């Protein structure tokens, strides 16, 4: 499981906070493009050197052009507001799952080298992590900040735009003058060059070798809902998933 996130550097609004089963650049780009439907396009982004950010960086460079410097890269330690967010995400969301998974491993319930166990873990817990992240994001974006006169991050984000409502800042005009935007051609330059982006940090998350058919997937989702309550922190649901999917393999062996 991989967590990808983005925070607005001015207001501290969490723009997106997602859990997925891979660390691929297209996954991050999908989260970014989904977020701009709510928060619109930023004028500039700051990322670390991870290759998972390469498509977002390419997208921004293609949209604004290389000369406007829309992408700043560097060690994440310099991105202090994002680092503070990650600290709280771990403390209030991820540490619970972190401890739970280690407990499952210590009790021989989870074998991290077993593909079936990893498949079941992702099936049950990715939706649960997503729910927890969504709830955290809602609370974070609406909590009062003493440094901002007790305005929430979302209030600060909104106030920031209207403070500069009379300016010609592109990012402000894009939000306030939505009727003037041609969304069919917004940010598209078919004749522009594709920028070359170099990165030095590459974390590879291998994909599961277990691939269920559509019929098997439907049977699994009908039988076991990841978010249903089992009064065991999802452990019983995980064990049921292991047994249920294992039956598919037993059936394949018998039929062959």
Task: Please name every model-derived segment.
Residues 170-209:
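Polybasic, proline/glycine-rich intrinsically disordered low-complexity segments
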């Amino acid at each position: 499981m991989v967590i990808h996130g983005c925070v607005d550097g001015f207001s501290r609004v969490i723009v997106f906070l997602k859990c997925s089963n891979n660390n691929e650049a297209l996954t991050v780009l999908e989260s970014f493009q989904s977020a701009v439907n709510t928060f619109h396009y930023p004028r500039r982004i700051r990322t670390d050197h991870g290759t998972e950010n390469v498509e977002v960086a390419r997208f921004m460079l293609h949209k604004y052009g290389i000369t406007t410097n829309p992408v700043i890269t560097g060690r994440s330690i310099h991105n202090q507001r994002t680092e503070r967010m990650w600290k709280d995400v771990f403390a209030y969301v991820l540490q619970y799952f972190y401890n739970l998974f280690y407990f499952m491993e210590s009790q021989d319930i989870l074998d991290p080298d077993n593909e079936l166990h990893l498949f079941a873990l992702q099936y049950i817990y990715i939706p649960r992590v997503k729910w927890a992240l969504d709830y955290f994001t809602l609370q974070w974006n609406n909590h009062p900040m003493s440094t901002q006169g007790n305005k929430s991050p979302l209030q600060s984000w909104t106030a920031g735009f209207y403070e500069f409502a009379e300016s010609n800042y592109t990012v402000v005009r894009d939000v306030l003058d939505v009727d003037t935007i041609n969304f069919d051609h917004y940010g598209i330059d078919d004749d522009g060059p594709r920028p070359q982006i170099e990165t030095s940090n590459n974390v590879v998350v291998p994909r599961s070798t277990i691939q269920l058919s559509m019929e098997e997937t439907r049977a699994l989702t009908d039988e076991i809902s990841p978010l249903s309550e089992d009064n065991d922190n999802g452990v019983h649901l995980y064990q049921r998933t292991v047994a249920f999917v294992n039956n598919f393999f037993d059936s394949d062996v018998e039929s062959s």
